[in-house]
């Protein structure tokens, strides 16, 4: 059986390795648009601040090492652009195409960039990959002030680590509290006070309207005023990387692929795991988008067991 996995970070590498382990006769191939696979996404902010000193420490396995350990073939810098469900094939940006018996979509998600002026200026960053973290870390070496837009987990972790590098850091968020939708107001207030004790400034109820400056970012304009900064990090959440299958006929909600308890989609032999898929909240029993590394690993394991006939 030939199993094609699109995406090679948490979910993709997890499901591929387990599928190969369960049946060595399976032909399992990972195709990823990235240069690297299996990197520690949760460690990216701490590489920015220097708590993780070396870039190499973020990479769990190189493609070569991963292939040697698992028997899974890895094809890097291969971006999928379309899927033909009738002929069971995937086409890539470089013009190549491959056939599959089973297709696993594990393409993850990308940072949201708001539709405001200035988001493409030099000195404006998002954080999702090792390269992103390296760029932020390098740029921060030559500036004094940073503005982080977004007060959820990633935004606050980036702020903490930029502060650790000696920068003057301001976090802005349009919500009335930090960690909106994650902490209740009382707990959020306590966390806010603890963060402010480190010298990080927090401005709430501030909706981003523009990135200010010339060619380089010089701060942000919000509905409550402007804030100066030599660099801006946008931490406004992520969106699923599913545009390339938007016309495939997959059931989706807000760009995320709907799957059942075994990670099957509504199309035969097509599955989805990780940040590009919805999962079922086992408490509420409702569909939920959970772009977390832990969720990616769990869904990858569930799918591998289902395909292997364990569950």
Residue ranges and their predicted role:
Residues 107-165:
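Glycine-rich dinucleotide-binding loop and its adjacent helix/turn
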Residues 25-29, 69, 74-92, 98, ...:
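A Rossmann-like FAD-binding core segment of flavoenzymes
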Residues 38, 100, 113-114, 156-157, ...:
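Glycine/Thr-rich phosphate-binding loops of Rossmann-like dinucleotide-binding domains
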Residues 1-72, 153, 161-183:
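Beta1-alpha1 glycine-rich phosphate/pyrophosphate-binding loop at the start
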Residues 120-143, 215-305:
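FAD-site-proximal beta/loop scaffold in flavoenzymes
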Residues 92, 105-106, 148, 222, ...:
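Redox-cofactor binding/interface segments in oxidoreductases and associated redox assembly factors
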């Amino acid at each position: 059986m030939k199993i094609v996995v699109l995406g090679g970070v948490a979910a993709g590498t997890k499901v591929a390795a387990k599928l190969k382990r369960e049946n060595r006769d399976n032909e399992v191939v990972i195709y990823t648009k990235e240069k690297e696979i299996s990197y520690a996404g949760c460690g990216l902010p701490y590489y920015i601040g220097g708590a993780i000193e070396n870039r190499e420490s973020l990479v769990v396995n190189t493609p070569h090492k991963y292939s040697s350990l698992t028997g899974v073939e890895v094809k890097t810098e291969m971006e999928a652009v379309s899927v033909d469900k009738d002929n069971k094939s995937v086409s890539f940006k470089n013009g190549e195409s491959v056939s599959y018996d089973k297709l696993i979509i594990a393409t993850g998600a990308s940072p949201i960039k708001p539709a405001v002026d200035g988001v493409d200026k030099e000195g404006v960053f998002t954080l999702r990959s090792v390269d992103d973290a390296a760029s932020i870390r390098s740029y921060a070496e030559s500036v004094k002030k940073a503005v982080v837009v977004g007060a959820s987990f990633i935004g606050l972790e980036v702020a903490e680590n930029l502060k650790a590098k000696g920068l003057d850091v301001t976090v802005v968020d349009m919500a009335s509290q930090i960690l909106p939708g994650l902490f209740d107001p009382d707990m959020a207030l306590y966390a806010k006070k603890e963060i402010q004790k480190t010298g990080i400034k927090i401005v709430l109820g501030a909706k981003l309207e523009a990135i200010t400056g010339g060619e380089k970012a010089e701060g942000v304009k919000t509905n409550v005023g402007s804030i100066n900064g030599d660099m801006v990090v946008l931490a406004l959440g992520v969106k699923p990387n599913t545009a390339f299958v938007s016309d495939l006929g997959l059931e989706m909600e807000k760009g995320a692929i709907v799957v059942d308890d075994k990670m099957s989609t509504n199309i035969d032999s097509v599955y989805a795991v990780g940040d590009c898929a919805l999962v079922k909240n086992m408490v509420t029993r409702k569909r939920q988008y959970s772009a977390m590394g832990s969720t990616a690993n769990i869904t990858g394991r569930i799918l591998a067991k289902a395909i292997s006939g364990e569950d």
